[in-house]
């Protein structure tokens, strides 16, 4: 699932949730820790703008978030 892929990519980048949230906030995407946690556990839908920002933060292609879904 997308949330698990986001978490896996975050771990691979050796970033904490707080670090990712800080980077998102600097990019103009306001997000709380609880909201981010919901994204990683698929309890909340992610916006395309958030996926694009995460791809930049993780230095990866947006398609990486969809790995194993098809």
Where are the model-predicted features located?
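Short alpha-helical DNA-recognition segment
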Residues: 15-38
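DNA major-groove recognition helix of helix-turn-helix/homeodomain DNA-binding modules
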Residues: 47-64
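The alpha-helix within a helix-turn-helix
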Residues: 10, 21, 25, 55
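Residues in the recognition helix of alpha-helical DNA-binding motifs
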Residues: 9, 23, 39, 68
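Short amphipathic recognition helices of helix-turn-helix/homeodomain-type DNA-binding modules
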Residues: 64-70
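A short, Lys/Arg-rich alpha-helix, primarily the initiator
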Residues: 1-13
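Helix-turn-helix DNA-binding elements, focusing on the entry/boundary residues of the two helices
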Residues: 6, 17, 33, 48-51
